[in-house]
Amino acid sequence: MPNVTIARESPLQDAVVQLIEELDRYLGDLYPAESNHLLDLQTLAKPDIRFLVARRSGTVVGCGAIAIDTEGGYGEVKRMFVQPTARGGQIGRRLLERIEDEARAAGLSALLLETGVYQATRIALYRKQGFADRGPFGPYGPDPLSLFMEKPL
């Protein structure tokens, strides 16, 4: 298997911008706009976001981020995505583990997330990694197309 690295990088690189555009198209095909809670590239580049890039043999194949809520003491998992051609190699799991490491290093007590109900593989990964269902949090309201999850750290 080719070498996979995961590191904090800028989301403003051309290859990452293309990956985020691919993610936006994917989510746009699954959910209506009001059920897509996406952080834009400029927000992903802010200091309270830890943006991670997965590379396989140097090529961008995935990403994930943690948005730090210092008032709430938690981090929110955002923008988790692995290109379809790179799936099956544990890259998503490794990204999520690195996000957990970043959250612990920031002194956060929990990771929270919102994901879409039609993403069974992603939901299974979150559950396998110890996330449990919970109600809406932060800026979110109830949405039949959203699933909210939490993992204490």
Curated annotation (Swiss-Prot):
The keyword Transit peptide does not apply. It comes from the Bacteria. GO terms for molecular function: acyltransferase activity, transferring groups other than amino-acyl groups. Residues 4-153 form the N-acetyltransferase domain. Keywords: Acyltransferase, Transferase. The keyword Acyltransferase applies. It is an enzyme of class 2 (transferase). InterPro entries: Acyl_CoA_acyltransferase, Bact_Acetyltransf, GNAT_dom. Its EC number is 2.3.1.-. Signal peptide: none annotated. Participates in the tryptophan-dependent indole-3-acetic acid production, which is a phytohormone released by A.brasilense. This is IAA acetyltransferase. It comes from Azospirillum brasilense. The lineage of its organism: Bacteria, Pseudomonadati, Pseudomonadota, Alphaproteobacteria, Rhodospirillales.
